[in-house]
From Swiss-Prot:
Nacreous layer of shell. This is Uncharacterized protein SMPP6. It comes from Nautilus macromphalus (Bellybutton nautilus).
Length: 6
């Protein structure tokens, strides 16, 4: 799974 935080 990919997790993107910004």
């Amino acid at each position: 799974a990919d997790l993107f935080l910004r």
